[in-house]
Amino acid sequence: MFVVPLGQVDIDLAKFDEVVHQYIPSGHNIHNTPIQEFVQLSELKCLPIIDVHKANCAIGSLGGGNHFIEVNEDDDGCKYLVIHSGSRNLGVRVCQYYQKMAESLCSRGFADRNEIIQHLKAEGRANEIQTELSKIKPISVPNGLAYITGEVQEHYFHDMQIVQMYAQMNRETMAYIILAKLGLKISMAIQPFHTVHNYIDFSTSGIILRKGAVRANQGEQLIIPMNMRDGSLICVGKGNPDWNFSAPHGAGRLMSRKKAKESLSVEQFTNVMNNVYSSSVCEATLDEAPMAYKPMRAIIDAIQDTVEVKKIIRPIYNFKAKE
């Protein structure tokens, strides 16, 4: 997520919505030509499986599901542009590549092949390699148990750092487009900041994999989104080692997407969103209705060991992709 403080400014929300619809592709849509080019893509170890042009065209576009663009307001009337989006399929492609490699490397057949090849070469029996390899019966490894080590692991870490930088550029590009089109400026009262989840934290103290969690180091500013009606919590991390220096990345769902669509109505959705300007409240986004998520009060009570809640910022505008 990316948080951009705007200060006490007046925003024409209808115009804001027009800009988002016109200049920010969303869901499965991307730009026809690149708005920005991320030069580090050429450094990916798995570059042959990446469509670089498509990845560059996706910079400055919003993902689907729970990804969003919001204008939020605090109790002092200060506005915030908040953008929740990630690596736009690039990360998925990279992860799928290394997952398949892990499954291959972890099969007994692959390990035995290496051992046999090295052994026969050392004994000067290279002519027997093909015969011996044909005798091996590979064993498949369940996806969840496959792993990588050595050079392949280093390549994976290297590529994931690039993907995470790409995701950051994507969010910043969307913010730049919106602010430039509307003539809005960043308030210096609070520095813009990113809060990232579902990523690998390559910190100096070691590697931490955070799934459904965000970094909450001592004194670190972060945002925890609740839902499209109640907004987000601006927090400061407590650096609690018992919580792995982390906090939850959001409220979490009370209902699955399927259950939300089955049990909630668009009328209910519309009623609870009546104080938020949004052209995204419809059947297509019903699974993102506020009622599908855990209540904010319960989350605030549960996260006291991880962060100090500094303020609640509430949406006055929300946009989600209609997938």
Show which residues each predicted segment covers.
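Domain-length cofactor-binding catalytic modules of enzymes
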Residues: M1-H31, Q40-E323
